[in-house]
Amino acid sequence: MSQIPETSDIVLIGAGIMSATLGTVLKELEPSLSVTMFETLHDCGQESSQAWNNAGTGHAANCELNYTPQRSDGSVDISKALEVNTEFDISRQLWAHLVGKGAIPDPRAFLHPCPHMSFVWGDDNVAFLRQRHREMAAHHCYHGMEFSEDPAQIAAWAPLIIEGREPGQPIAATRIISGADVDYGALTHLLVKQLQAQSGFSVHYKHRVVALARGADGRWLVTVENVTTYERSTTSARFVFAGAGGGSLDILQKSGIPEGNGYAGFPVSGIWLRCDVDDISARHHAKVYGKAAHGSPPMSVPHLDTRIIGGKRSLLFGPYAGFSSKFLKHGSYADLLRSIEPGNILPMLAVARDDWQLSEYLIGQVLQTSEHQFAALQGFFPRAQREDWQRAVAGQRVQIIKPDPQHTGVLEFGTELLASADKSFVALLGASPGASTAAFIAMEVLQKCFDDRLTPDAWLGRLKQMIPTYGIDLKKDADACRDSRAKTAKVLQLDFV
């Protein structure tokens, strides 16, 4: 293992997809930067980025119904879906750039074309999906989205969700073939590998950040401990990024920046059902998202997915949520307790008071028997057999609890970047939509903390080589959107319609 440097321009805490993406972007923009990455575990991409710890969806908001709520007048609000949809374009452009220059030799090592579908049953849900399709298909970002209420057509798209279904049941589906299944664990390894081939980059596994303090010169003193030998080292850094998933809140609290006052975390665990039977997985080629039960939170949307991991095809169904006090899958049951501070007790109590729907949902999920869980799968796949499926534990998701002047504290289901006033420290909190928007989040870090470098005589030219549509609103510019998707689809070997 390489020696820990005494000084570094950039320190990245956590070796998941977020840190790997930001490190890649920064080294592309300024190759002379020294970048040091610290990771508690033995390898990169072992927490939420690891393939079976997430759904692997290229979240382009094609099929996730929670991004398109229905208004009281029956119309559908697609504004959030459009945001997520075009954020994924940033990831596609970054990946295509890296493939084009040979930094990632083969896109199929982490990315596979996979249609994205929405599937519902019941008259009200069919009416909702019909209206959703009407509004989305009219927008250029969703060009080519198909809709059907015909069981034969839906069976041609995804036979397992139709076979054995009650005849005459009202059903509907949408499909868009330009979707993807992404192995974010493999992608993280590819990004870190190409970083390790560059001078000025080092990654240090089995090193936990135990202290974070300001030096007299204004730089950050990052103290890490070797989890095997307990030896401690300190690196002086100009800029620190906490991209440690559920561990980012702890790093934020260690930093002491006032911008983090009052923030807390609410951990949610997840369970999948997984099928590795070749004869079954070979007959399902789609990510099929359903409609969550009324009143349930966004992370509860059920889906039946194709997964391709290490060349092996499998199916995944879930998630079933639960409660665990851990902030990381490999964390401690004391994580939640340790995160409580005088400044965040009131926001946490306010959320406990106001968010009864979430509490009821989680209690219901925890109390579910395996029979209840399997019945939910059979709602999607009527002929599913219990012996073909096994339980798999997903990664931990830590939702944001933040101070709020009106309610004291509120629970948020997105992601948020919290930066220090002098732009030398930033922490990424939250869980959704997550890995799919890692490149977009990297752009947000640049705009928050390196805006002085985003000029024509500094980074702007290189940034536009990486992200050709930087500065263009793809939600409004149909030609730029279509051109970008055609080009990235060709490089990344994705379907384009």
From Swiss-Prot:
UniProt pathway: Carbohydrate metabolism; tricarboxylic acid cycle; oxaloacetate from (S)-malate (quinone route): step 1/1
InterPro entries linked to this entry: FAD/NAD-bd_sf, MQO
Keywords: FAD, Flavoprotein, Oxidoreductase, Tricarboxylic acid cycle
Essential cofactor(s): FAD
Catalytic activity annotation: (S)-malate + a quinone = a quinol + oxaloacetate
Domain of life (superkingdom): Bacteria
EC numbers for this chain: 1.1.5.4
Keyword Metal-binding appears in the UniProt entry: no
GO molecular function, one term: L-malate dehydrogenase (quinone) activity
GO BP annotations listed: tricarboxylic acid cycle
Pfam families per the UniProt record, alphabetical: Mqo
Classification via NCBIfam families: mal_quin_oxido, PRK05257.1-1, PRK05257.1-4, PRK05257.2-1, PRK05257.2-4, PRK05257.3-2, PRK13339.1
Family: Belongs to the MQO family.
Protein name: Probable malate:quinone oxidoreductase
Organism: Rhodopseudomonas palustris (strain TIE-1)
